[in-house]
From Swiss-Prot:
It comes from Alligator mississippiensis (American alligator). It holds the Pfam family HMG_box. One of its GO terms (cellular component) is nucleus. GO terms for molecular function: DNA-binding transcription activator activity, RNA polymerase II-specific; RNA polymerase II cis-regulatory region sequence-specific DNA binding. It is found in: Nucleus. Keywords: DNA-binding, Nucleus. This is SRY-related protein ADW2. Residues 1-69 bind DNA. GO terms for biological process: brain development; camera-type eye morphogenesis; negative regulation of transcription by RNA polymerase II; neuron differentiation.
Length: 72
């Protein structure tokens, strides 16, 4: 069972598509670096919708997999 996405992952899922549309030949590693830098530049207020989205996913995950315990 996969862990639920965190706020960065929720945000980056949408942003990654935008970058790939603009630069289809860009390597995944470079896209990830850009996403990380852009996320760090966002204001906390801009992150709120993604934090809330991640929290919804976390709660759903807890309901769906009540006995789940992360084991790396």
């Amino acid at each position: 069972v996969k862990r639920p996405m965190n706020a960065f992952m929720v945000w980056s899922q949408h942003e990654r598509r935008k970058i790939m549309d603009q630069w289809p030949d860009m390597h995944n590693a470079e896209i990830s670096k850009r996403l990380g830098r852009r996320w760090q530049l966002l204001q906390d207020s801009e992150k709120i919708p993604f934090v809330k989205g991640a929290e919804r996913l976390r709660l759903k995950h807890m309901a769906d997999y009540a006995d789940y315990k992360y084991r790396p």
